[in-house]
Amino acid sequence: MPHYRSRTSTHGRNMAGARALWRATGMKDGDFGKPIIAVVNSFTQFVPGHVHLRDLGALVASEIEAAGGVAKEFNTIAVDDGIAMGHGGMLYSLPSRELIADSVEYMVNAHCADAMVCISNCDKITPGMLMAAMRLNIPVVFVSGGPMEAGKITSPVDGKVIAKLDLVDAMIKAADPNVSDAEAEEVERSACPTCGSCSGMFTANSMNCLTEAIGLALPGNGTIVATHAWRKGLFEQAGRLVVELCRRYYEQDDASVLPRSIATKSAFENAMTLDVAMGGSTNTVLHLLAAAQEAGVDFTMSDIDRISRRVPCLCKAAPATDKYHIEDVHRAGGILGILGELGRADLLDLSCGNVHSGTLGEAINQWDINGGAGEAAQKFFRAAPGGIPTTVAFSQDATFLTLDMDRQTGCIRDKAHAYSQDGGLAVLYGNLAEKGCIVKTAGVDESQWVFTGRARVFESQEDAVEGILGDRVQAGDVVIIRYEGPKGGPGMQEMLYPTSYLKSKGLGKTCALFTDGRFSGGSSGLVIGHASPEAAEGGTIGLVEEGDTIEIDIPNRRIHLAVGDTVLAERRAAMQARGEQAWQPVDRERVVSQALRAYAALATSADRGAVRDLSQLKR
């Protein structure tokens, strides 16, 4: 029978000093036999996805204590990728994932907490906490702050919605010289109306959806908007549930509730199956690979490639379409609705466990609105956006008049009526990416699935932006942005500005972009990232020259630099001859801090999740 970890610091005469300090935090005599549960919050006023979380830690804590536990809250950092985008701040985004994972480990192990509730939301916070949960392997429940409502422009005549908006629309309009200042400002003011994670199937929402599929979050975690009153129930339930999980593990020796027991290889494959089916952000590939490594699960790019070849695209939301946002996915039945369709297509392992319903199959039976779910589920998925700008959680209780149960032409489709039988994400291989690269096929126009173009080479994101806005990129070009990988950046910047500017220049369907960096979940078009190995690690992307021909073939999962092997060997030899300057950008002016240098020293390429290679450290 496992012992409560917290007894290390709460029991025995030699722990008198620790108990004295615990008492100074408010603990009473009767609390020392209870489980101590960490409430891992990520509130910050810097990030709209987290600005409303200040009081939610206390809400969870009150439920923990009502259920017989002791709650102790702490905060992690949280970087807003949108605000950090397009300047040196983006260098810090991906490395912050490792800091979050480490800081959670530090706090939980230093204070011998027995379990956790992780209150996350945005891009690197959910993955960082997920990595920590796998590392610590103590009972955990994830509950996110929830998605932002989509922005809306209404008719001045009848008030009806004439367009839905998000952050990406604001960026594209602002960069389009044909758009007036007045129109650009209207979109800017309307694009992000409420608290919550950005309203499309971007990285934050993708990851919060995937925690449902892995089995560590409650139904609706990824889709019910942050402002809705019914989301409060997820936080209350999380507080009660984590105490139950604690007792099952520590008092009943039930290890099935532990993260590593739930997040098995089959669970990671289920999550990736969902990811491909819903056209999730390409960043999710990095984060699932990283979390799997922390869990000790052998889940690799080859598994992702295998899954992507057999799973159809069953759901589309912005940026893959301007018709649907996450709030519309919720109305169609949320993640359990998509999982239900995948289950009926025999594409899931329904025996995988979770924190709330026994098995995935049981969860689908209870929550899939097209699979016979009861009245509670039918009501829950009617939760709608309120349409009132606010930074306050649970501030409205609007409901949809009807559910979207149309599996032929609706937001969520069945396999027979899939958006495409090819999934929403694909892994490409070739001499430009021997270890693979990722494309979000759900966001690529089918006319571009096979594409050949001329290389326009840039050694940094900043140079690429300047080149695109300066009309140095033309229809038929393949924009190459290199030395932006985990080690070469360092930090593997997102390329939302270059992809948005290609659209604003009218090149969204006539150009491609290939990089060893990564993309915001808001990027769409023929944009291919995560080239592995990256340029700084000797990847072939570092040998591409201006005007080279690049061949892209999504159906055959191929990307190829049309240069002979002899020429490539000569280029590689010339690069190696540069000595210490080999595999580094030429004439790039970028200040790299000591903190980023420390990350770069251990960073791996994207095919390993851009995690740190700790095997380099000597014991």
From Swiss-Prot:
GO biological process, one term: L-valine biosynthetic process
Cofactor: [2Fe-2S] cluster; Mg(2+)
Binding site for [2Fe-2S] cluster: C122, C198
Keyword annotations of the record: 2Fe-2S, Amino-acid biosynthesis, Branched-chain amino acid biosynthesis, Iron, Iron-sulfur, Lyase, Magnesium, Metal-binding
Catalytic activity, EC: 4.2.1.9
Residues that coordinate or bind Mg(2+): D81, D123, K124, E494
Transmembrane segments: none
Cofactor binding, per record: Binds 1 [2Fe-2S] cluster per subunit. This cluster acts as a Lewis acid cofactor.
Role description: Functions in the biosynthesis of branched-chain amino acids. Catalyzes the dehydration of (2R,3R)-2,3-dihydroxy-3-methylpentanoate (2,3-dihydroxy-3-methylvalerate) into 2-oxo-3-methylpentanoate (2-oxo-3-methylvalerate) and of (2R)-2,3-dihydroxy-3-methylbutanoate (2,3-dihydroxyisovalerate) into 2-oxo-3-methylbutanoate (2-oxoisovalerate), the penultimate precursor to L-isoleucine and L-valine, respectively.
Record's subunit section: Homodimer.
Listed name of the protein: Dihydroxy-acid dehydratase 1
